[in-house]
Amino acid sequence: MEKNRRKKDDAGVMTKTLAGVAALTFLVSFICSSYDITFSHVISTIDVILEESEYYRSTKEWMASSIDATWHEVSIPSRKAEHLQAINPEVDVAAGGKHVFTPEQLHFFDGSRDSKPCYLAILGRVYDVDGKKEYYGPGKSYHHFAGRDATRAFTTGDFTENGLVASTHGLSHDELLSIRDWVSFYDKEYPLVGVVADLYYDSDGQPTAELTDVLARVEKANEYRKAQAVEIEVFPPCNSEYNQNGGRVWCSTKSGGVERQWAGVPRKLIEQTTKKFRCACVKNFGPGVSGAEEVKTSSNRGDLDHPDLELFPDCSPTSNSCKIVS
């Protein structure tokens, strides 16, 4: 997708190109030092000679487009969803020349007609992406988004006709937050020109009950993300290593990417709804940091008495490392 996708066959071209650049750099350096010729003169001469090669010309074009794409991508906001503003469902279609499109009308704005600009929709919001036809125009990487509301595909990457749909039914918390990231990106980078009267807006341009429901799910996902961030600070993930016979988990003062003053001991942290677990490093001395009622009665057991924790089988309660048997 626009933010982070590259065609797989680009990897081979990149490898060849980097090898060529390395060889060219060595050659230019040798010529400059041996014959006291300026760097720019040598480069321009070699460029003229190599322009006769179709591979060289195509590689230059590929590198130029890749650099342009990279600069386009770095403008996308970082994915710290809890810091992004909530999506405002209200779009004033009566002001600023905004329009209410039917899905059929929006289809005419897929970039294939010279008489019409290129539009796309996400969560029913229609954006003018005509200024970036190198991405959204016919035959380009993201043309499948043009002329339609393909909200679901922005996060699933399913570009079949069944996947290029507006529905968000069944999407996970992370996928819903990804959609919010995309809306934030398009709000910042492209003009909002209207809405599409379909799943998220009615024929008067007013938000539907479906949009209200989706935004409520997005907010719930955001709260879940915040709670996860807090949980990671309280119960950092364990270090781990695995092989065909099993593996081991252990704790350190930097395990899970969370730097702290204590290492802790490994425990199963149970998610009560799904009963799934992950390995967590648990503070095992002094006052607890989780705030759970069960740990407040002890002043020197850390969070060991938290109700969502279990011991690993055949592992000492005081051990800093536990074996995992496959």
UniProtKB/Swiss-Prot annotation:
Keywords linked to the UniProt accession: Secreted, Signal
Location (main, coarse): secreted
Subcellular location: Secreted
Keyword Signal attached: yes
One GO CC annotation: membrane
SUPFAM superfamilies linked to this entry: Cytochrome b5-like heme/steroid binding domain
Domain Cytochrome b5 heme-binding intervals: 98-197
Signal peptide residue numbers: 1-34
UniProt record similarity statement: Belongs to the cytochrome b5 family. MAPR subfamily.
Known function: Heme-binding protein.
Domain-level remarks: The cytochrome b5 heme-binding domain was proven to bind heme, although it lacks the conserved iron-binding His residues at position 136 and 169.
UniProt protein name: Neuferricin homolog
Organism: Caenorhabditis briggsae
